[in-house]
Amino acid sequence: MTPIQKFNRQLAAAKLLSPQQTVVVAVSTGVDSMVLLHLLQRLPAAERPRVVVAHVNHHLREQSQMEADYLRQYCQQQNLKLVMADWLPAAHPKSGIEAAGRQFRYHVFAKVMRENRATAVLTAHHANDQVETYLMKLARGGDISQLTGIATSRPFATGRLIRPLLTWSKDQLRNYAAEQHVVYFEDVTNQDVALTRNRIRHRVVPELMTVNPQLLKHVADYQQQLTTLLTAKKQMVTVLLSQVVTATGALVVDQWGALPSQWQLAVFATWLEQQTQQLFTESKLQPLVSWGQRTRPATSRLTVNAAWELYRNAGIIEALPIKKRGKKLMPREKIMVDLNQWQKITATQTVGIFTRVPNVVSQPFWLTEADWPLVWRPWQAGDRIVLKGGGHQLVRRLLIDRKVPAERREQVQVLVNAQGNVLWVVGHKFSYRTTGTQTVFLALKHES
């Protein structure tokens, strides 16, 4: 099957081969989008959908206005409807400009889609884009589902976002443009290897292609296999989850704990996402799962984030929304530590535990695997810290010795490990440690 036949088949599968359908085509004037527009124009009149061209001038390059002028002239000659939008320099952020530009661009596409009652937005992502994205995400790390890559089709605005050129390589697009005399513009910023994607595009991918010229196909095959496996996993988790929740949606600890260990995290993650309508990373989920698997104490609370907490009682775990408290009050339950994140634990204190030295005053501290999960909580009667030489000191005595007023003592927070041992009386004193398996940096910021 030729690439053009694949293109036509994909449009047919999306039910777009009809003059009664309207599609929005995102056109930048680069070779990818100009070929996409040309392919649509080549469709037989009886099958060709109504085409609305959407173009965003980001005003990031001097060449941008020339490209916009050319596209305006081209659409007039071809009798195509053109909608143009300007992302003016005054709206450009000082940092994160690429992400902000993408957000503006897709906001425009959604608006054009609604105004023209279009069924789909078509973009010109291709096989090389797919490989570049795959390698970038592989290098950055994260959830394995991210390696499934750019989806051929997904819900978007009032219809779908479709990428019909994902099976085309960049070379195929260039060859098609040359054969069909398609005029396009080269974005000079695509040559800037200071940008991560451009380094991968110009250095990494060509080198890998010398190892195996079938790189694009092999990555696409891996992504399809991964998609199939993740779909099967999702179906299995749905079945298992139905066996371990109550009619009210609570997680039954014994039944969940009886699942094979490799399924407990996946089932817990899906349950929590359904309860909160939020997504969580595996690093965030692992301590929650460890807390849920403990049998003591029988009744316990654990803060997930600013909006949700977990409550375990009578053999079940519930996800409960946190009621807003007054600014000067602090939570009376535990707050789970998020590694490498600042966390506000009182009205005036923000703390963090970092694996690298932060840009504020910090205290190096030894941790072990057994310490996790760590939590912040108000100090309690009986809490004590380890002193140099092996002795201990009650937190209550420490605060009295430091002449902390009684009304302020209640606001003092401590960092405790999984065994309940105090590692840090925040703002006052650290427990003494000289060994461990991991060095972290404990930091505190005061706010008025």
Swiss-Prot record:
Domain comment as written in the entry: The N-terminal region contains the highly conserved SGGXDS motif, predicted to be a P-loop motif involved in ATP binding.
Purpose: Ligates lysine onto the cytidine present at position 34 of the AUA codon-specific tRNA(Ile) that contains the anticodon CAU, in an ATP-dependent manner. Cytidine is converted to lysidine, thus changing the amino acid specificity of the tRNA from methionine to isoleucine.
EC number: 6.3.4.19
PANTHER family membership: TRNA(ILE)-LYSIDINE SYNTHASE-RELATED
InterPro entries with a match to the protein in the record: Lysidine-tRNA-synth_C (IPR012796), Rossmann-like_a/b/a_fold (IPR014729), TilS/TtcA_N (IPR011063), tRNA_Ile_lys_synt (IPR012094), tRNA_Ile_lys_synt_N (IPR012795)
Ribosomal protein recorded as keyword: no
Coiled coil stretches, renumbered: none
GO molecular function: ATP binding; tRNA(Ile)-lysidine synthase activity
Catalytic activity: cytidine(34) in tRNA(Ile2) + L-lysine + ATP = lysidine(34) in tRNA(Ile2) + AMP + diphosphate + H(+)
Assigned protein family: Belongs to the tRNA(Ile)-lysidine synthase family.
SMART domains linked to this entry: TilS_C
Keywords: ATP-binding, Cytoplasm, Ligase, Nucleotide-binding, tRNA processing
Chief location bin: cytoplasm
Localization: Cytoplasm
Record has Ligase as a keyword: yes
One GO cellular component, as annotated: cytoplasm
Pfam family, one: ATP_bind_3
BP terms from Gene Ontology: tRNA modification
Residues bound to ATP: 28-33
Gene name of this polypeptide: tilS
Name of the protein this chain belongs to: tRNA(Ile)-lysidine synthase
